[in-house]
Amino acid sequence: LAGVLICTGNPVISQGKVQAQLQVVRSKTMTVTLEASGGRMVKKASVAGTVTLPSDRNGSDYTFLGWSTKRGQTRNPQYQAYETIKVTRNMHLYPVRYRWSQEPDINVKNLAANLDQYSRIIFVGDSRTVMMGQTLIGQYQNSVSDKVSFICKGRQGLAWMKETAEESLTKALKAAEAEEGATAVVFNLGVNDLIHRRGTEFDYQKKASEYITYMKNLAKQLSGFNCKLFYMSVNPVNTAMKHTRKESEVRGFNEALQKGLGDRYTWIDTYSYLMKFGYTTHNEFRGGLDDGLHYSMKTYKRIYSLVMKNLKKS
């Protein structure tokens, strides 16, 4: 009888082990199916039950924004590229594609002129700022350039800011002292310092720390001028179109800067605005090229408009 009791006890323990093993197997086999531009893609969840979502290419008439459980969504994706999500069940995700034909062509001619609290607005940035300036001056001439100026150069970042742009900005602020009212300075740098080779590790936190340290010191140096400082987020990129930058690192860089700059700078979150409402990557300055980095003139005007609204609220 004792032997029988021993025999009936062991299978129960074994059954519990089998059930536990089955649960582990089930968690490993959770999948996310993505309807990508190149065809259906299936990604298995890791042992931790997570999946990192890929990027996807832009089309000839749309910008890829991210992923959603809803088919046909055109803006404000549920998930963004290179976002790591927890998978508790099998999922089916569809690309969120912003159709270029739906982008409004807004008139921003008088936005700066109507901004009474600032006598001058200075944008400091890289090629994205260059193209925004070219768009505004090309379409509105003196109505923009009389009050708005640009200190910018393509393919530049923090080193250029230290070596060249800082001196140019200081001179511009000294010249503006003769004018009534404060000067608004809007910085938009960082995307070129997030470049790295595909597949290599990149410490964006370290790069963000370098920016934060420098920008805080710069704010102290500029405290003697009648100016207010703003920092515009690094705006969206598409890794599938240009592999030298990753979406998740742009987001992480922005989060670090927004937190680290503190109250010395007013943060302008154009990144979230563009992801929510969409943007166009058909770049007229490069023959309509879509390089996953630069935008259309319509998008540059919308970015400028959002900046002006933030300046007005400050």
Label for each model-derived stretch:
Residues 121, 185, 229-231, 267:
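Hydrophobic/aromatic residues located in beta-strands of well-ordered beta-sheets
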Residues 115-206, 210:
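Conserved SGNH/GDSL esterase-like catalytic core that processes O-acyl groups on lipids
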Residues 205-216, 247-253:
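Charged helix-capping and loop-helix junction motifs
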